[in-house]
Amino acid sequence: MASRFLTEEWAGEVSSILNSHPGFKSSIANADLGIVYNVTGTPSGDVAYFLRTAGGNADLGLGTLDNPDVTVGSSYETAAAISKGELNTQTAFMTGKLKVGGNLAKLMMHQAVINQWANAVKDMEVEY
């Protein structure tokens, strides 16, 4: 059964998938990273969710973090296209569809985390 994008159910399923995916687990082995994503214009209004990695574990949930390393903002359309694999994050950033703030050097240092996240969830059934 598909999880609805950007809901608690979706966040829980993504978190579970990430923590059981060997490639993702390898990418976060030494990553202490906090990212907050702000998505505007969703069917439920604006939604914030976060990814926190520390100690070889990942936590993804709805809401925000105190003092995230990086903040990412996008429209629902862009977030859904990235989630569906129709748009990669680098292209979205380069075309201005993703607004990124905070410690960009740290984000680039841990680019494998983002790449492995996409790889881990590529077959997840999601309802948009």
Residue spans for each PLM region:
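Feature captures hydrophobic
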Residues: 1-128
